[in-house]
């Protein structure tokens, strides 16, 4: 959903990879609300690319008395190799999300159906259990588009940005920003 909004997307993949400056420019898309961004989400490869950029600048890396580890641009960092953060193509693209507080909320919808089935007459008694449940997902500033995404969507449908409609009156009241960089740079 975030990458479908040009106003909060910093796509430098045509000329550059992920850098601190690129992340800062993505955060700047929130303007005076950039302090609402509380966490950056990235792959392990991107995280280590950024740490490598810091290591080449050793004179500034330890200039402060308190060294904060895993803190990029004053934001917490979530490192996960989630497939959605890397898109193969020409060029291969790496995504870094800058998320606002409450960007995504997952909640139990309270619908739990379970069935236990026991089968006799075989060499051993067989008992199986199957449980189905439902949950809800909310993205800050967006609503689910049932016409495009369906009433009971698959994981692929949930991950398709065009299935989420922006309802926030101001882009700064949405889930966050995204930086897209060339994975080879």
Where are these regions (language model features)?
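Short, glycine/acidic-rich hinge or "gate" loops at secondary-structure transitions
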Residues: 1-8
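Structured, hydrophobic secondary-structure cores that serve as assembly/anchoring elements
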Residues: 2, 20-52
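Sequence/fold signature of self-assembling virion shell proteins
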Residues: 14-18, 49-185
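Surface-exposed ligand/attachment interfaces on beta-rich extracellular proteins
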Residues: 8-25
